[in-house]
From Swiss-Prot:
SUPFAM superfamilies: Double-stranded DNA-binding domain. It comes from Pyrobaculum neutrophilum (strain DSM 2338 / JCM 9278 / NBRC 100436 / V24Sta) (Thermoproteus neutrophilus). Signal peptide: none annotated. Keywords: DNA-binding. Belongs to the PDCD5 family. GO terms for cellular component: cytosol. The keyword Coiled coil does not apply. The keyword DNA-binding applies. InterPro entries: DNA_bind_arc (IPR022889), PDCD5-like (IPR002836), PDCD5-like_sf (IPR036883). This is DNA-binding protein Tneu_1679. It comes from the Archaea. Pfam families: dsDNA_bind.
């Protein structure tokens, strides 16, 4: 019977650890959702509806580029380096700058 008690404690410890992992994961997901909602609110304030629609289209095709662009837009607007609201043409210019920074260059030697 002593072995059964040991196995029960071990099983309970495994369950407790798994529960902690799930709780941590849920908390991280919740924080990510809050951050995304805050970014969305900021973007709605600094972009025209047409520019926001273009950003949404970019997000569908290139999510990593859209995220970099969002960060750049929020930084530019908060520092006052760009006029708010940002229209679609200005967004295109910023997009070109961000895209050229994020584009990877590959070199092949033959």
């Amino acid at each position: 019977m002593a072995e059964g008690g040991y196995e029960d404690r071990e099983l309970e410890e495994l369950r407790r650890k798994k529960l902690e992992e799930l709780q941590k994961k849920a908390e991280l997901e919740r924080q990510a959702q809050i951050a995304a909602a805050q970014r969305r609110i900021a973007l709605k304030k600094i972009l025209t509806p047409a520019a926001l629609a273009r950003l949404d289209n970019i997000r569908v095709v290139r999510p990593e580029l859209a995220e970099a662009l969002e960060q750049q837009l929020i930084a530019l607007a908060s520092s006052g380096r760009v006029r708010v609201p940002i229209d679609e043409d200005t967004l295109k210019e910023i997009l070109e700058a961000v895209y050229s920074q994020s584009k990877r260059e590959y070199r092949f030697r033959l």
